[in-house]
């Protein structure tokens, strides 16, 4: 065997042996661990030791950071050297950057000049252009994560929160992360977000460079009352003298409230390059003017004569202007306003009063200011369309204030609620439910949520679904209706004052969004309109919308066509139509009633087939006997068919009985043992226009119930799935919220909904029924196995359940898989060694595969990997789903301090609920004789004590 080349590494390219690392002084500490200066292969490196290397939640972020750094190579991104796994911990090794970070640089005295500040902004924009081109969102952009080398060139680091932005509909993320003070408002409000959140954080970094202040402490202290919006006027007031106006404009653009109005990093970079060039020109002009002034002063020979007073360009700042000094405003007010124009000016004052100034600002700067102004003028109505105030408990609309400062009230710096008030770096990932004061949801925040749901430029259907599912937890229906009505009749905001036609076009889009919102509301949750005065409100809205449409037609009749006008929504008609549909569903019989009715009228499989197919019968007798019976009893068959039609009409809600009337051909297909009859339909269709599969009819039995071993495994799995599908599809989405309220809610609350209470209504009724059905199926499996006293019958029963579980897995009925396999791995059945020894090898191999799926290892990892790829219809494990929802409920608060709605919490619940509810029925034909076996009364099933005793009877323990 050839020897390995000694010049090649013997380990993986990114693996670093612990012995090769040299640790020096500790240079920092972050949310995931400590950072040391060290040495690797003679090079200075930074070594990050992970404190919680055994925590799977932390390791997820560490693995993400490592994978990101491995794939990134850029001059302004920290270079990754490798990773070291050792018994003492986990270590990430990167290049050592010796210049500290930008936050430390801004604290230095004397402060850095504007050329260096703009250079940092340009370099950071280049790095972000690179990241976004690779579809990477950093999500934790801040000055502490921007390192500086010895030449004060940046290195972007800390990719623990970074994510890939997939090019799909799911590209808008919802995970709440980032650092308080820099995080975008849409993240704080629990809304979906994309790469624009990095643009906002970048704008906050620019604000640090402009003011030298720390966000959330002495700059932009955001509060829930303003929905975490920022005040751009505060930036201009606190900016350091000499700041280029273009830089302020870029910063304000980046920090716009609406994500879609923020610029891309390509645009930001081009604007900053213009600003950088203008600054170089101004600096060169100022230096030339200063040199000329110095030469002129040297010519003057008489010192007693007043000489011109030379004021040098203010490129660097006085040491008295400390970055964190709270008296900066007083210092700034005493400086000439000419310094803040972005062009350094020199005033030469003499007795004659002559002045020489620097060249004027190039036209590119004014164009940028105009560009920023035009972008702000085209902002959506999300911010300014209406200001809703709660006066004496009544909701009223007021015109927007004229002063931009008054329109964004801010709390003082000593306020109880303050972004960045808590030192935790992990931020909103660590929010926990704690005992504390109860808050009422802030009306201004709910208003913002309504504006987002009815936005004229961005329409997010998932946001509307999540809002409608969860809003009852923080607002009554009447309040939501009033906010929607105010949104519908909103007056023209100040940025459309001179463009009434433009405003009317935007208003039509908003009104259309409001109408669509109402229709979705009626379609998804018509029961909400049973609340007091809600029907009257809908009638009133129909009248208002009709008047609005008439006014719009009169005002814009000459500029728009008739087909562009809004159609009267007639919401009350929509509600009545929906209620008519619900009244039909209320008449549905329960599945047990259906089965009992059929079983009372039919005591053999032949009649069961007649009840199902509304046609002729098929049984296991000879074809001649069948023909004779059909001819002699045609009248009876017709009567049976009529009865069956009535039964099916009464049970059409079961989604499993709606069989289309079609010509059906019958044939007898027998397996090797001549035991099963097979029904084949030529034109029969099931739900979704899919053909029903071939039904396998079990042989007749003289006893009350069929024996499980006599039922074909495929048909057994189908009948189990039919029952599970019926119970699961009856669960309403809000029942999950009711269930977790029952399990995790506070004792002081009588309902999870605001303004309502449960009166003669059982919360989460259908969930409890489905849970009981799954538990009864598990008891049924144990009962059917342990009631068999003979070994071969027990073996046949176990093999039948294993085969049925495999078929249920193919049907994506995970609830049935868990209900069947979990009893088989229980000690009472697993101990039956003689029985398991006779099970076939194929079934044993299948059973091992099923055990791996239901295994609790790594928090049901195998099951969680299969579930996202399952195509509907799919029935999840209800127990695990409820546990996940309960964990979300207890892991974060519903309301944040100040009354802000933690909509991220509700969106997590909603996404999990709606993704699990793939409300499609399986296309299987019911066999009542089999369903009768599967729906035995609970009193006929073994309890835990009987299961244990019968297990000992089947195979008594061997005494040693």
UniProtKB/Swiss-Prot annotation:
A family per Pfam: RasGEF_N
Residue intervals of the Ras-GEF domain: 712-957
Family matches, as PANTHER family: CENTER DIVIDER, ISOFORM A, LIM DOMAIN KINASE 1
Identification of the protein by name: RasGEF domain-containing serine/threonine-protein kinase X
CC terms in the record's Gene Ontology section: cytoplasm; plasma membrane; pseudopodium
Domain N-terminal Ras-GEF: 437-565
Reaction catalysis annotation: L-seryl-[protein] + ATP = O-phospho-L-seryl-[protein] + ADP + H(+); L-threonyl-[protein] + ATP = O-phospho-L-threonyl-[protein] + ADP + H(+)
Enzyme class label: transferase
Keywords: ATP-binding, Guanine-nucleotide releasing factor, Kinase, Nucleotide-binding, Serine/threonine-protein kinase, Transferase
Active site: 140 (proton acceptor)
Protein kinase domain sequence ranges: 21-274
Low complexity composition bias: residue spans: 314-368
Purpose: Promotes the exchange of Ras-bound GDP by GTP.
A GO molecular function held by the record: protein serine kinase activity
Region of interest (Disordered), ranges: 314-372, 393-413, 596-651
E.C. number(s) listed in UniProt: 2.7.11.1
Gene Ontology BP, a term: small GTPase-mediated signal transduction
């Amino acid at each position: 065997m050839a020897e390995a080349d000694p010049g090649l590494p013997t380990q993986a390219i990114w693996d670093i042996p612990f012995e090769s690392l040299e640790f020096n002084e500790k240079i920092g500490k972050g949310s995931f661990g400590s950072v040391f200066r060290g040495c690797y292969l003679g090079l200075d490196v930074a070594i990050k030791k992970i404190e919680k290397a055994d925590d799977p939640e932390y390791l997820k972020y560490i693995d993400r950071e490592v994978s990101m750094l491995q794939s990134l190579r850029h001059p302004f991104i920290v270079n990754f050297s490798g990773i070291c796994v050792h018994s003492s911990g986990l270590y990430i090794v990167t290049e050592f950057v010796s210049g500290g970070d930008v936050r430390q640089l801004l604290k230095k005295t004397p402060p850095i000049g504007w050329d260096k500040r703009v250079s940092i902004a340009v370099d950071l924009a280049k790095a972000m252009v690179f990241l976004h081109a690779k579809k990477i969102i950093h999500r934790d952009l801040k000055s502490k994560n921007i390192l500086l080398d010895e030449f004060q060139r940046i290195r972007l680091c800390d990719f623990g929160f970074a994510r890939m932005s997939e090019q799909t509909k799911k590209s808008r993320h919802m995970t709440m992360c980032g650092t308080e003070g820099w995080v975008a408002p849409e993240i704080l409000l629990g809304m979906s977000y994309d790469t624009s959140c990095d643009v906002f954080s970048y704008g906050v970094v620019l604000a640090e460079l402009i003011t030298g202040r720390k966000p959330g402490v002495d700059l932009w202290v955001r509060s829930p009352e303003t929905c975490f919006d920022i005040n751009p006027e505060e930036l201009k007031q606190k900016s350091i003298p000499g700041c280029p106006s273009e830089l302020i404009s870029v910063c304000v653009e980046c920090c716009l409230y609406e994500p879609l109005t923020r610029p891309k990093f390509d645009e930001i970079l081009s604007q900053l390059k213009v600003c950088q060039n203008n600054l170089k020109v101004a600096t060169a002009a100022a230096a030339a003017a200063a040199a000329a002034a110095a030469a002129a002063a040297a010519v003057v020979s008489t010192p007693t004569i007043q000489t011109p007073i030379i004021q040098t360009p203010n490129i660097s700042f006085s040491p008295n202007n400390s970055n964190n000094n709270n008296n900066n405003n007083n210092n700034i007010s005493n400086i000439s306003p000419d310094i803040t124009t972005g062009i350094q000016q020199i005033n030469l004052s003499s007795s004659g009063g002559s002045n020489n100034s620097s060249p004027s600002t190039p036209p590119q700067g004014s164009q940028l200011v105009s560009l920023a102004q035009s972008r702000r003028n085209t902002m959506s109505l999300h911010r300014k369309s209406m200001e809703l105030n709660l006066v004496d408990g009544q909701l009223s609309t007021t015109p927007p204030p004229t002063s931009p400062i008054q329109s964004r009230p801010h709390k003082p710096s000593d306020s109880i609620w303050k972004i960045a008030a808590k030192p935790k770096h992990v931020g909103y990932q660590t929010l926990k439910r704690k005992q504390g004061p109860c808050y009422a949801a802030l009306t201004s925040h709910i208003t913002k949520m309504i504006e987002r749901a009815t936005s004229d430029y961005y329409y997010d259907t998932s946001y509307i679904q999540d809002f409608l599912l969860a809003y009852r937890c923080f607002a009554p229906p009447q309040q939501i209706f009033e906010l929607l009505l105010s949104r519908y009749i909103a007056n023209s905001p100040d940025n459309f004052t001179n463009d009434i036609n433009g405003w009317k076009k935007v208003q039509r889009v908003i009104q259309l969004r409001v109408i669509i919102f109402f229709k979705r509301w009626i379609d998804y949750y018509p029961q909400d309109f049973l609340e007091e005065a809600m029907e009257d409100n809908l009638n009133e809205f129909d009248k208002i919308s009709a008047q609005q449409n008439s006014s719009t037609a009169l005002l814009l009749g000459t500029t728009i066509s008739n087909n562009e006008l809004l159609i009267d929504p007639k919401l009350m008609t929509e509600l009545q139509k929906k209620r008519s549909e619900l009244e039909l569903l209320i008449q549905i019989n329960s599945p047990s009633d259906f089965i009992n009715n059929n079983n009372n009228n039919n005591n053999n499989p032949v009649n069961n087939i007649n009840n199902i197919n509304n046609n002729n019968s098929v049984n296991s007798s000879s074809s001649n006997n069948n023909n004779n019976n059909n001819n002699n009893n045609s009248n009876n068959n017709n009567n049976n068919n009529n009865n069956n039609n009535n039964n099916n009409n009464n049970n059409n809600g079961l989604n499993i009985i709606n069989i289309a009337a079609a010509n059906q051909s019958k044939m007898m297909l027998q397996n090797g043992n001549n035991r099963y009859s097979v029904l084949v339909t030529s034109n029969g269709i099931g739900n979704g226009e899919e053909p029903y599969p071939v039904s396998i009819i079990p042989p007749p039995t003289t006893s009350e119930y069929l024996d499980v071993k006599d039922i074909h495994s495929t048909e057994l799995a189908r009948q189990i799935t039919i029952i599970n599908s019926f119970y699961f599809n009856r669960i309403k989405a809000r029942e999950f919220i009711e269930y977790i309220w029952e399990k995790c809610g506070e004792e002081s609350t009588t309902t999870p909904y605001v303004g309502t209470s449960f009166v003669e209504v059982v919360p989460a009724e259908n969930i409890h029924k489905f849970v009981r059905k799954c538990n009864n199926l598990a008891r049924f499996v144990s009962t059917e196995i342990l009631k068999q006293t003979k070994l071969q019958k027990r073996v046949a029963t176990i093999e039948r359940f294993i085969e049925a579980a495999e078929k249920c897995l193919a049907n994506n009925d995970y609830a049935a898989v868990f209900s069947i396999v979990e009893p088989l791995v229980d000690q009472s059945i697993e101990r039956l060694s003689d029985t398991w020894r006779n099970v076939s090898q194929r079934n044993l191999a299948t059973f091992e595969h099923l055990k791996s799926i239901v295994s609790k290892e790594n928090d049901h990892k195998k099951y969680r990997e299969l579930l996202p790829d399952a195509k509907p219809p799919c029935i999840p494990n209800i127990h695990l789903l409820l546990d996940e929802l309960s964990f979300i409920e207890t892991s974060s608060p519903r309301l944040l301090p100040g009354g802000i709605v933690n909509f991220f919490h509700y969106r997590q619940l909603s996404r999990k609920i709606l993704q699990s509810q793939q409300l499609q029925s399986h296309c299987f034909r019911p066999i009542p004789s089999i369903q009768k076996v599967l729906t035995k009364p609970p009193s006929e099933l073994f309890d835990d004590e009987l299961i244990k005793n019968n297990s000992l009877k089947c195979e008594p323990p061997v005494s040693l």
